[in-house]
Amino acid sequence: MNIFGIGLPEMIVILVVALLIFGPKKLPEIGRSLGQAINSFKAGARDFENEFKREAKHLEEGVKVSTSASEPEKVVDVSSATNTNKN
């Protein structure tokens, strides 16, 4: 078992130290608060990503509309036709 680069023996040591520091009554409360904070952070990151994708799609659609609305102008090079008769 390897979570965040921490193996099982390290996790046990961390839990024992946390149990000694906070006590058995506060440990579940702290775990619950930590879990809620992590879930809130994930939800915020997901919302940010969705908003970013939505704006990128909106910008792409705007660029497609503006490029399809204006047709490129045709340019004719007249100088090559007049230079062939100078020999």
UniProtKB/Swiss-Prot annotation:
The keyword Ion transport does not apply. One of its GO terms (cellular component) is TAT protein transport complex. InterPro entries: TatA/B/E, TatA/E. It is a single-pass membrane protein. Its main location: membrane. GO terms for biological process: protein transport by the Tat complex. It is found in: Cell inner membrane. Coiled coil: none annotated. The chain crosses the membrane at residues 3-23. It comes from the Bacteria. GO terms for molecular function: protein transmembrane transporter activity. It holds the Pfam family TatA_B_E. The keyword Transcription regulation does not apply. Residues 61-87 are annotated as: Disordered. Keywords: Cell inner membrane, Cell membrane, Membrane, Protein transport, Translocation, Transmembrane, Transmembrane helix, Transport. HAMAP family: TatA_E. Part of the twin-arginine translocation (Tat) system that transports large folded proteins containing a characteristic twin-arginine motif in their signal peptide across membranes. TatA could form the protein-conducting channel of the Tat system. NCBIfam families: PRK14857.1, PRK14861.1, tatAE. Forms a complex with TatC. Belongs to the TatA/E family. This is Sec-independent protein translocase protein TatA. The lineage of its organism: Bacteria, Bacillati, Cyanobacteriota, Cyanophyceae, Oscillatoriophycideae.
